[in-house]
Amino acid sequence: MANVVVVGAQWGDEGKGKIVDWLSERADVIARFQGGHNAGHTLVIDGKVYKLSLLPSGIVRPGKLSVIGNGVVLDPWHLVQEIAKLRADGVEISPQSLMIAENAVLILPLHGELDRARESQNSVAKIGTTGRGIGPAYEDKVGRRAIRVADLADEATLALRVDRLMVHHDALRRGLGIEPVDREALLAQLREIAPQVLPYAKPVWKVMNEMRKAGKRILFEGAQGALLDIDFGTYPYVTSSNVIAGQAATGTGIGPGAIGFVLGIVKAYTTRVGEGPFPAELQDADGERLGERGREFGTVTGRKRRCGWFDAVLVRQTCATSGVSGIALTKLDVLDGFETLKICVGYELDGERLDHLPIAADQQARCTPIFEELEGWSESTAGARSWADLPGAAVKYVRRIEELIQCPVALLSTSPERDDTILVTDPFED
């Protein structure tokens, strides 16, 4: 029996929520290990739509333990709102079904204020953040001045942490023309929210290791995508955490030996939200068609996603950096009706052909795609649950992707409904 890590293998929005929900039915524990409430996921269960951005996808399934690991930065006010919204939808949430790492870092109102002020004043190179304070919270974590969940339990410690934080943030705020932090107001907000968060606080590393020893199935749920990884993404147009599969161990404290199968989620075409290089981007009728058919708008921000053809170069790269065992290919049905499809198989940079995306931002921006054309199909793939249900051209398209990315397809998703899935390899089997 293998524990499974699910990671996005593009720029996020690959359909991880559906796949995680599909797998979570057989998992005992579903753990998030990085990111914040900046990456949303949509679940469709029995015709009912759930939109989550912080809580693990398993939270909507009774009898499962959902975990927010130490690698996550936690906005406690958003947490309480998301819990309340799900409860209103009939989802039961208690400390028996939700556990938060005691050493998870808190996102405070001052982090969002700093995030938005920087982005609004940065006319040279906007990063395209969601403005929710994720980046500044990670900065404070690395700078050893963050407030963590456990700090909420002791008022004296909390006051010391706030004072240390203010030394840094007030200096930044002066430079940006923002009023200083209101110390007493912040402390009052934290005291008020503490009783609503602390019941869920646990030593996640300990519980997770105990679960592993007891033979429980663990599903690690990544947010965003590997091309937004702070080290291996299109820097600086990235998120502020490691997104690749190795972070599942670091972000929960369970150790890399616990990971048995890495499932990379890959859309049958490519999308990106916000700024940054996108070699295979389409700024024509085909790009508009992909966006309309795929309903490419962000779950959290509502921002329109940029669309392009499938980029095999990037996915091959992310499969390598995450050690992907197999991919789940999603949204194949969006390609129904295209007479011709294209796959990016390489880049040209200054007259030279490349088989990978260079690390330097200026070179990334100058890369032009080299496309391979494939025959499209007119039949519908929506709702297909076996290879026999797929048009021959669609099967050829999937097989060509496998060849180019040097990684097999483990799952194929053909609609937002969780059961419209073709299983090739069961990630939970050893």
Curated annotation (Swiss-Prot):
What InterPro entries is this protein classified in?
Answer: Adenylosuccin_syn_GTP-bd (IPR018220), Adenylosuccin_syn_Lys_AS (IPR033128), Adenylosuccinate_synth_dom1 (IPR042109), Adenylosuccinate_synth_dom2 (IPR042110), Adenylosuccinate_synth_dom3 (IPR042111), Adenylosuccinate_synthetase (IPR001114), P-loop_NTPase (IPR027417)
Q: Which GO terms describe its biological process?
A: 'de novo' AMP biosynthetic process; IMP metabolic process
Q: Quick one: a GO cellular component term?
A: cytoplasm
Residues bound to GTP are: 12-18, 40-42, 305, 331-333, 413-415
Q: Quote the record's binding site residues for IMP.
A: D13, E14, G15, K16, N38, A39, G40, H41, T130, R144, Q224, T239, R303
Entry annotation: catalytic residues: D13, H41
- What reaction gets catalysed by this protein? IMP + L-aspartate + GTP = N(6)-(1,2-dicarboxyethyl)-AMP + GDP + phosphate + 2 H(+)
How many cofactors are bound and how? Binds 1 Mg(2+) ion per subunit.
Q: What is its EC number?
A: 6.3.4.4
Keywords, in A-Z order: Cytoplasm, GTP-binding, Ligase, Magnesium, Metal-binding, Nucleotide-binding, Purine biosynthesis
Please name one Pfam family that this protein belongs to: Adenylsucc_synt
Q: Cite the binding residues for Mg(2+).
A: D13, G40
Question: In which domain of life is the source organism classified?
Answer: Bacteria
Which pathway features in its UniProt record? Purine metabolism; AMP biosynthesis via de novo pathway; AMP from IMP: step 1/2
Q: Give the function comment from the record.
A: Plays an important role in the de novo pathway of purine nucleotide biosynthesis. Catalyzes the first committed step in the biosynthesis of AMP from IMP.
HAMAP family for this protein: Adenylosucc_synth
Q: How does it assemble?
A: Homodimer.
Under which name does UniProt file this protein? Adenylosuccinate synthetase
What gene is it encoded by? Answer: purA
